Structure formats: C-alpha cells, structure tokens
C-alpha cells in the first residue's frame, strides 16, 4: 500500500498516510521524461487504487460512462463517487474506502431500510444510508466518525451523526470529486 502511495502520490481513499516529501525528490530524479503512455497508466492506477477496483470493474465503468451523455471522464468519476463504499467514506462513517467496503460486506449498512452487502451498489438521489440497530454496528460507525478529521461534507450528502444516518441529496457535482485526475 505504501509503495503505491509513494509512486502515485496521496490517495485519501486508500489510507490516511501521506507520502514523505523526500520521496518526491527520488521520483523526480528517477523519472526523466514521462511518456504519454506512462502518464495515462499512472492516472488509471490512481483510479483503481483509490476506489479499490479491479481492472475488469474499471473497464465496465468506462464502458458505461462511454455510452452516457456528457464527458466520459466526468461521468466515470460520478459513477465511481456514487458507489456505496465511497459514499460511506465521504460521510465519515469509515476512515478509508477499504474500511467502508468491510462495513458493507459484514452487513452493518442499510440502504432505505434494507441490508446491502455489495460495496459497488450504486446509490441514487434520496437514498437513506443507516446502520443496523445492533450495538456493534453503531460502535464501529461512532469510532470512525469520532476519529475522522472533520472535512467539509460534499453538498450532495447530509449526515446525522447522532442517528448514524446519511442521505444522498443529488448526484455529485464535479467540483466535489475527491481525487484529482489529469
């Protein structure tokens, strides 16, 4: 994980750690001239590792985004940002996207009152995301909300930390997308 961060730069969804400033110097010395192929490959790898996707999943999302109206890149980022695991991360219910995936896989999360155990579930506007009523589920979310740095919440999401409830208001705006891709 840390090799990926040193190579690609900060990936907030993968881990809370940041690369040291000295590693940038090493990369600059080693890099030389960056080819167009290398730039595209690094940007693709950033997407894969940040959102925790396999190559096949990413290709499916690119295919869906290509069919949709609008800029393929913007539609792709909107699709990835509207995944359930990413929304839990943005709400602060999990400290990282892999942590959010684990919450979903272990059936701690309800969407509109139903258990959802698929991290790639595509959330829609007006979806209500809550935790199970079990004490263990609420404790996991409470620890994450308490320990997470209180960053500004994107305007397409609202959270009620006392009821452990989040709401998807609308499809994400392009200015709120967390990962900067070239």
From Swiss-Prot:
InterPro entries per record: Ribosomal_uS4, Ribosomal_uS4_bac-type, Ribosomal_uS4_CS, Ribosomal_uS4_N, S4_RNA-bd, S4_RNA-bd_sf
Domain of life of the source: Eukaryota
GO molecular function: rRNA binding; structural constituent of ribosome
Statement: the UniProt record of this protein carries the keyword rRNA-binding: yes
Gene Ontology biological-process annotations: ribosomal small subunit biogenesis; translation
Keywords associated with the record: Chloroplast, Plastid, Ribonucleoprotein, Ribosomal protein, RNA-binding, rRNA-binding
SMART domains named in the record: Ribosomal_S4, S4
UniProt-annotated location(s): Plastid, Chloroplast
Listed Pfam families: Ribosomal_S4, S4
Ranges of residues in domain S4 RNA-binding: 82-143
Signal peptide: none
Annotated SUPFAM superfamilies: Alpha-L RNA-binding motif (SSF55174)
Function in brief: One of the primary rRNA binding proteins, it binds directly to 16S rRNA where it nucleates assembly of the body of the 30S subunit.
Membership in a protein family: Belongs to the universal ribosomal protein uS4 family.
Protein name per the record: Small ribosomal subunit protein uS4c
Taxon lineage: Eukaryota, Viridiplantae, Streptophyta, Embryophyta, Tracheophyta
């Amino acid at each position: 994980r840390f090799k990926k961060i040193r190579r690609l730069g900060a990936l907030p969804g993968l881990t809370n750690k940041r690369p040291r400033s000295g590693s940038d110097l090493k990369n600059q010395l080693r890099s030389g001239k960056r080819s167009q192929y290398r730039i595209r490959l690094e940007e693709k790898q950033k997407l894969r590792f940040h959102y925790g996707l396999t190559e096949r999943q990413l290709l499916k999302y690119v295919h869906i985004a290509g069919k949709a109206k609008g800029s393929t890149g913007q539609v792709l980022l909107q699709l990835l940002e509207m995944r359930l695991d990413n929304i839990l991360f943005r709400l602060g219910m999990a400290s990282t996207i892999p942590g959010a995936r684990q919450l979903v896989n272990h059936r701690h999360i309800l969407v509109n009152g139903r258990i959802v155990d698929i991290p790639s579930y595509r959330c829609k506007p007006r979806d209500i995301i809550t935790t199970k009523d079990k004490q263990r589920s609420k404790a996991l979310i409470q620890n994450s909300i308490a320990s997470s740095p209180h960053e500004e919440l994107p305007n397409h999401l609202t959270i009620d930390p006392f009821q452990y409830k989040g709401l998807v208001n609308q499809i994400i705006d392009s200015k709120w997308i967390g990962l900067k891709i070239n």
